[in-house]
Amino acid sequence: MTNQPSDLLSPGAHEVLLDGLTQRYHVYGSGPVCLAVPGGPGVTWDYLRAPGLEEFLTMVYVEPLGTGGSQRLPSHPDGYTRERSARSLVSLVDRLAVPPVFLLGHSHGGFVAQYFALHHPDRVRGLVLYESAPVTGAEHMAEAGARVQEFAARNAGRPGLPSALNGLQTVGSLTDDEKITDALRALMPVYFAHYWDREDEFRDLRARVTCSYISALDENGEPDVIDDRERLTTLGVPTLVLAGRYDVICGPRWAEELHTLIPHSRLTVLEESGHFGHLEQPDVFTAAVRA
């Protein structure tokens, strides 16, 4: 457990007690502090490492509650709402005792980041919504279904396609950590623009990624509804919206909508990326964040 304030931003892994729960995070790089919130929910943090950003930012990669080395809620697997996640981030920023931070959220982490920025704008120096969306639900799933069909058509005849599509189809119905991890590893090619053409680059990541089951329900068993469209029009935090052209789950349609909704935001579409532009086009990704 890291206890001394001077050590909280030293390089490496840290554990702190926040609101009675153990919170784990990892520090790399130097410069202004940027908290990075991974997707999932439940996916291990390390896929989100972005060495290019670490050249000019102190990256604080958060392991969200219920994930990896961070403690589970008593209501696990329920209760991991955006409000609860944002509360944890506020406590972490307080403990770090730093000025307003940069905040980068990827995928589900983007949903958390935009909630945080909307409710705690005074804590945020700049916001990066990376593969996020302003709303989820039926419309979001319909768009994802159409994008998956496009992916399947582009990759027709690939030996690994049936397994990847099966993983995508089954992952949402699983509640066992090991089975979810297996399905996640199976479906990962769908989340890249050109996975099979670049398999040597991404094979190790696919083999090591893990996921814990976290539901989409609050502690009372009610859905944690995401629809930020109205409130995003009031967001005054400087915001960069990033999306991969070939992302099937939070692609350009949602990035463009975020950009339209958020005043004075910037939009960058990574033309040869899927869901993981920081891995697929790291130089372009880094340049967009640095700008």
Where are these regions (language model features)?
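Alpha/beta-hydrolase
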Residues: 148, 160-230, 237
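Conserved hydrolase catalytic core segment
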Residues: 99-143
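Flexible "cap/lid" loop of the alpha/beta hydrolase fold
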Residues: 127-171
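Active-site loop/oxyanion-hole signature of alpha/beta-hydrolase fold enzymes
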Residues: 61-104, 108, 287
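Conserved HGGG/HGGXW glycine-rich cap/lid loop of the alpha/beta-hydrolase fold
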Residues: 15-78, 92
